[in-house]
Amino acid sequence: MIDSARVATVNIHQSLLPTYRGRHPLNWAIIKGETHTGVTIHHINEDFDEGNIILQKKVEILNNDNVMDVYWKATEVVCEMLYGFFDKAKKGNLKGFRQDPERATYFPPRIPKDGKIDWGESAENIYNLVRALTYPYPGAYFYYRRKKMLIEIAKPEKQGPLGSKIGVPTFYRGAFFVKTGSGFLKIAKLRNANLIEIKN
């Protein structure tokens, strides 16, 4: 395919390469607590996500953004970038520049079981996992009394109900709170394994 291309064989990758090479870069960026990611149009070569960079543009990640919020921001940026790409193509200016291997990071594909919550983590880290795995992804989940629970909307809190145990939901002031390794997670929307919302 690469050899048969008339002009160039390119890919649109949802990160600022060479960081976040690999699959699911938007999810990983949110999980890692990044405040921005980006979009890269780059050449395809024999190595995964390592071709010359033609164009890049930054995408902001707000603290309350979930993965679909960031996806739509990135999609808008792609549409804007394509004008510049086609302009470069018309001028025969698609060589781009080499990626810096010293800055490269790679992340593996994610699978549903990766969404299991470790309540020993900080509330902030768990919050990042929740917002990185919202619909249409499988979701961040935990088991309570042998039943699978999916967290759809949550936020970290410094304070919560006294006497709470790590990983055990407590109904407090109109919401479920779960004590974590550092702080509390306040759950605003919770579903069971059948995706039925659990009301407070």
For each predicted feature, which ranges?
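Donor/substrate-binding cores of folate-linked one-carbon enzymes
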Residues: M1-Y106
